[in-house]
Amino acid sequence: MLGLSLLLSWGLALTQTPLFGDFMLRVKPAAHDPYDTKFYRKFDRLLAGLLRWRWGVVAGVVALFALSLAVMGLMPQNFFPSLDKPYFRADVLLPEGYNIRDTERNLRLMEEWLHEQPEVKTVSVTMGSTPPRYYLASSSISLRPNFGNILIELHDRKQTEEVENRFNAYVVANCPDVWLRSSLFKLSPVPDAAIEFGFIGDDIDTLRRLTQAAEDIMWRTPGTANIRNSWGNRVPTWLPLYSQMKGQRIGVTRSQMAQGITIATQGYRLGEYREGDQFMPILLKDENIDAYNLTNLQALPIFTPAGKVYSIEQATDGFRFEYRGGVVKRYNRQRVMKAQCDPARGVNTMELFAALRDSVTRAVPLPEGYSMKVFGEQESQQESNSALAEYMPLTMILIFIVLLLLFRNYREPVIILLMIPLIFIGVVLGLAVTGKVFNFFSLLGLLGLVGMNIKNAVVLVEQIGVLRAEGKGPYDALVSATRSRIVPVAMASGTTILGMLPLLFDSMFGAMAATIMGGLLVATLLTVCVLPVVYAIFYNIRES
């Protein structure tokens, strides 16, 4: 969109500007030199001093650039900002092994409390899974009987955090079995946890040991919240030991035995029934499903394709009772167990992640055959940054080629590209003054600043070349071109800065606006002052 807009504006500038200029602008003989003013005389003295102390100017700019990079590393960073909406959502998770009735009971308590709050406008509760996608960046969770989701709308956005904190305190006091994760709406899909360290390997006990060690570090680290793992707790499991010999004798396979257990415990899914836009599962259940317990499970009926019925005891060598993981997750077909946590309210995610990564890497040794991978928001950020950086070298090469075709030598393109680092000085200043954090939109604004600063530099360098071609001396052409381009460059940058002003107070695009405004303001000032110095160094221009 930006590329198309710039292309169209370029075409209009070449056609409409001369047309309207011919109608509306009239050349008047100048009564005096327009540059013979106090401002321009002071600027000439400033520029002469900068050219006289050129190497000191270069050293100062390099020092400012290094300082800005150092400060940038200390500034708070966030991948995607929260949306400025009067909503928050809460994911409710009970321990593995709890059924849908336990989930319903706890959700009803929370719903009743929320309806009693005067700040709450509406409450939407979904049980067993996440609701249909109600906005693009919402994340989905598959069917789980111990999961619920609550969407809360308030009358005023300013009340969101206060009600959210009260709601969290109520759940802790009245629903001790519930794990609750509440969050504001974000522009990007919210992962299972903001910070995740995944341990990959084969042995389940080893994975649990490594994950538990990482969880212990999270508990000891200030600023963490919602600490858990991706597999949840172990659940008591009743295991029938299938006998291949007995099963073959009566015609019962392992899958048929598993199907029989499903029919007698939770129901076997045969298909779906559709009514309007609603889909309801069709389940085959044993009519005695509520009568089975540990004392009579060995009498579960198993049906064969031949229509015969056998008890599960006739196809097994006995039964075993043990604790097993209710959930086993995989990554690239390998078992992965994640230690997960979120930052507490007001704690920067990137800073907390850096502290945890160093501690986990140092304190959790990995056995042979096991590895650790970072997931969560950090993984999403790395993927997005990699996608942006993938074609950056090609982009810079194409920019250099275009500048090379425009000026037909190497020195002018190099001088122009050397102005790009100046934008970092302004970006840091803009974010620091406005109190914004560096996020994904700031990165997009930073990329846009590259083109804006190159445009300003091209205008100045081209004017120097025009004056030199007209026969002016190198030093006079340098000073005159810089003097004459101050107003055009300042007007172009100033209108862009003012155009960003309405976005500065937006929760989503505020950081991008601060990046562009600060970067363009400082880069424009430094370009007008520093580019002539660099040009003079490259062409060895001195005052005659």
Which residues make up each language-model segment?
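Solvent-exposed, membrane-proximal periplasmic/extracellular interface segments of envelope transport
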Residues: 101-190, 216, 245-265
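Signature of alpha-helical transmembrane segments and their immediate interfacial
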Residues: 32-81, 107, 121
